Amino acid sequence: MKLTKLALCTLFGLGVSIANAADLPNITILATGGTIAGSGQSSVNSAYKAGQLSIDTLIEAVPEMKNIANIKGEQIVKIGSQDMNDEVWLKLAKAINAQCKSTDGFVITHGTDTMEETAYFLDLTVKCEKPVVLVGAMRPATEKSADGPLNLYNAVVVAADKKSSGRGVLVAMNNEVLGARDVTKTSTTAVQTFHSPNYGSLGYIHNSKVDYERSPESKHTINTPFNVEKLDSLPKVGIIYAYSNAPVEPLNALLNAGYQGIVSAGVGNGNVNAAHLDRLEKAAKDSVVVVRSSRVPTGYTTRDAEVDDSKYGFVASGTLNPQKARVLLQLALTQTKDPKVIQQYFEDF
């Protein structure tokens, strides 16, 4: 289905001069599907199917990108990001590592549902200092007010800017640049859904330029110990959600299924009820790594506060939310099962 003219009109008037292709940076776009490649039957209805449009179609819809970079597209998968999995994560990381020397930057088109998890996984596993920028959309390409075309254009602006190098993996959405470790989706429907609630944005995109205000302080990319080149799978780590009167059966199901790590999405400062605490203590004694996080959207999960992590052998997630704590724990388990070493990973990365 053709993209609506209104969706593309948002790019008019950007005023980017046409440059000689030989003088432009080379940017590789790795496409995975998502709403940015979504298609619906109506331009005024939010019903659509994700991942329908090819990377070639997305590139053709935003010809202005060719004024700022030489664009090459590669279709990795065509899925909604609710179906994102370890296999695709590994494929993306390996593709970026393999092509790092032959391109000046990468853009990854991705669904917004799990974008923050993919971004953080790549932040920990990509061994390349060149820009890696994830981008998506909250409205499908066929909707009248589609945000995807301008988001994609801006992502290329970010990837083509040398100032983006060395900042870790980035997310470019709605004129903002956000760091992979801190960014999270905050609204199910709003265009301005991505925020970094603990630390704020890294910078902003305006009139085809990036204005950076800060860089991430945590270690990333080339400064992590995680090498995925020989991996074809990741350790099994599950998340258990805490709430009033929460039963232990879901936790038992994961442990009985052989999960090597458990992340607790606790209440408040990562707290769980007495039954959960008892079961998690037993799991830790059986060499299952337990990480305490919180379902609360901002703040720290503090080590040795209400829960004596040192006594139980638990790991505290700091400012990582449960879904990102799971990502780091999966990678940590490829290196060690020592909770003291893993605690240091959570403080460093």
Curated annotation (Swiss-Prot):
The active site is at residue 35. Its main location: periplasm. Gene3D superfamilies: 3.40.50.40, L-asparaginase, N-terminal domain (3.40.50.1170). The keyword Flavoprotein does not apply. Residues 25-349 form the Asparaginase/glutaminase domain. Keywords: Disulfide bond, Hydrolase, Periplasm, Signal. It is an enzyme of class 3 (hydrolase). CDD domains: L-asparaginase_II. Substrate binds at residues 81, 112-113. GO terms for molecular function: asparaginase activity. Pfam families: Asparaginase (PF00710), Asparaginase_C (PF17763). GO terms for biological process: asparagine catabolic process. Belongs to the asparaginase 1 family. PANTHER family: 60 KDA LYSOPHOSPHOLIPASE, L-ASPARAGINASE. This is Probable L-asparaginase periplasmic. The lineage of its organism: Bacteria, Pseudomonadati, Pseudomonadota, Gammaproteobacteria, Pasteurellales.
